[in-house]
């Protein structure tokens, strides 16, 4: 079965809605990653993901760290993102979590599957199925109907 990959920032996590998010990142603060609100109904998302896993799908996160910053900052960003997932989706057992450097080709990092990402260039370079965040629930439900 395929892996279903989710981007975090701007896809399921509201990083860009955090006031002054860019200033925080430029000053190597992880606050926006910690303060981001969920962008969809996580109770429904968690239920759908568990059902899909029960039918053989794997689920994963593929997300970039900040565009700039020290190696230590990138490590703190990765930690903050993992903590965010644990706090907001505690019932989800992720098959993979890949937090990679900004600009990394996500398809080459993951090797395919289904991608949900807010960045059009990531969807365009994905050589398999890819969708915008607003399609998450609809697509997950349609996958369940197919199994």
Outline where the language-model segments fall.
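Asp-based, Mg2+/Mn2+-dependent phosphohydrolase catalytic module
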Residues: 114, 119-147
